[in-house]
Amino acid sequence: MTKTSKASGLSWFFCDLDGTLLRYQNNQHLIEPTTKRAVAQLVESGANFVVATGRKPSDVRNIYKELGIEQASPYLIANNGAVVWDLKRNSYLNKQTLSLSDFDLIDHINQTLNQLNHEYGCILYGLNDQVYFYHIHAPDSQAFKQYFAFYEGEFVQNQYLEIDGLKTEYNLVKAIWFFKEVHQQKAVIAQHFTNQERLVITSAHSFELVPLNVSKGHAINLIKQQVKITDNQIMVLGDSYNDLPMFQHGVVKVTNHLAPDNLKQLATRVYELPASLFVGQALNDYFKFD
């Protein structure tokens, strides 16, 4: 197989998961077969495909297995950059946890949302892939937990633990506030948390908090330094607010028409295609496989 690049020198591809590589449709999370083939061909050609997501590391590993690239992909970026795992060395390139002051902020946010009477859950993610239900504010907390687990997806193997306090030994890397109703989070942040720049909208249901100085963009920069590459070798693909730091890197920046305006403004290409399909199309547009 030979590779011809329309954008000379591209060899590293950093791709968001939910809403980009992965589409949620008919109560299922799916990757288009054409996109799977494009990723496989890309990797076979010698290029590097790295998932950069808010999800935890084991979720990315499962996606790599589904794509058939678990032996080829050199890194994974998880928890919005709080975890960067070097798959070749089997070690962390980066791991950062929430601080005691972050714990205070988490409790403050929960108290505010309780007063506003939103139906939501505060879920915490640990460095060891553990997921904790910290606070559920809903008429039926058990039904809410089941709804959240269903939303996480069929490729996720979570063992949820309930906790009633925050401890440093949990090694927490991320907090997520998940709302039962969609599109509440943007107004909540705008009206009540305008001074909290680290609160990032990550889906139609959620916003998140990660450790200070953590982002997908920072994670990409760490990889750039380790493997000694430049932006001219990089394509980034994303669809949401937590992808904005990622779009500070790369020479080709790809999203679709459903992305927020500030992401589309940074993009070099905006596709009128749904999630997953636009990733496959972008890879095929920039590479021709013979």
Swiss-Prot record:
Keyword Electron transport: no
Enzyme Commission code(s) on record: 3.1.3.-
Requisite cofactors: Mg(2+)
Amino-acid positions noted as binding phosphate in the UniProt annotation, renumbered to this chain: 17, 53-54, 216, 242
GO cellular component, as recorded: cytosol
InterPro entries: Cof, HAD-like_sf, HAD-SF_hydro_IIB, HAD_sf
GO terms for MF: magnesium ion binding; phosphatase activity
Pfam families in UniProt: Hydrolase_3
Residues forming the catalytic site: 16 (nucleophile)
UniProt keyword annotations, A-Z: Hydrolase, Magnesium, Metal-binding
Transmembrane parts of this sequence: none
Binding site residues for Mg(2+): 16, 18, 239-240
Family, per entry: Belongs to the HAD-like hydrolase superfamily. Cof family.
Name this protein carries in UniProt: Putative phosphatase MPN_427
Organism of derivation: Mycoplasma pneumoniae (strain ATCC 29342 / M129 / Subtype 1) (Mycoplasmoides pneumoniae)
